[in-house]
C-alpha cells in the first residue's frame, strides 16, 4: 500500500494540474480584461504598486451600492487603500437614466480628479432617495454643492459624447466581464457579486496580500 500511494498521488496531481493551470490562465485573462483601459478614464485611488486591486461596478441609484459606499468603503480606505495595500477603481454601471445622469455629473465635477469625483458620488449616495424622486433638482443641488453653476450642470448633462462613452464601457462590462448587477466587484480579477460587510471583504483581501 505504501508503495502505491505516491504513485496514486502523483497520478491525481497529473490529472488535477491541467484544470488548475486552465483556471489560473482563465483568471489571468479576466484580470487583464478588467484592467483594460476603457473609453472613460478610470476613477482610481491608492498606490499603483498595491498588491491588490479592487474594481467596483456601481450605480448611483443602487441602494446596496450606497450602503457599501457609506458603511464599508470608509473602513476599506483607511485600513487598506490609504496604507498602500489596495488600489481601488470605481466604474459606473448605471441601471437607469437617472444613474447615468448622476454619473455624468460626477465626471464633470471630478474633471479628471478621482477624489473630487468620489466626493460627488458620496454626496449623491447620501441623497439617493431624493435623486430618485427629484432627479433634476437633486443634480442641480449636487452640482452647486461642488462649485458648478446651473449653466455648468445643464451643459454637462448635454454632453452626448460622455454618454456614448459611458454606454460603451457598460456594454464592455456586460459582454466581456459578465457584469449583470450592482454592485459587482473584481478582486485581482476574481468576480464577486453583491455587497458585503467589511469583515467579509477583508477575509477576501487577506489571502491576496500574502501571494
Model-found features: residue ranges?
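Extracytoplasmic thiol/disulfide redox context detector
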Residues: 2-94, 167-175, 207-211
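C-terminal cap of thioredoxin/glutaredoxin-like
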Residues: 2-5, 22-31, 59, 141-211
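Alpha-helix boundary/capping residues
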Residues: 13-14, 72, 124-127, 146, ...
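Residue-level signal for pocket-adjacent positions within structured domains
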Residues: 38-40, 126, 187
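Structural motif
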Residues: 51-52, 115, 180
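Structural alpha/beta surface segment adjacent to cysteine/selenocysteine redox centers
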Residues: 60, 66-144
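Secondary-structure boundary/capping motif
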Residues: 64, 97-98, 165, 193
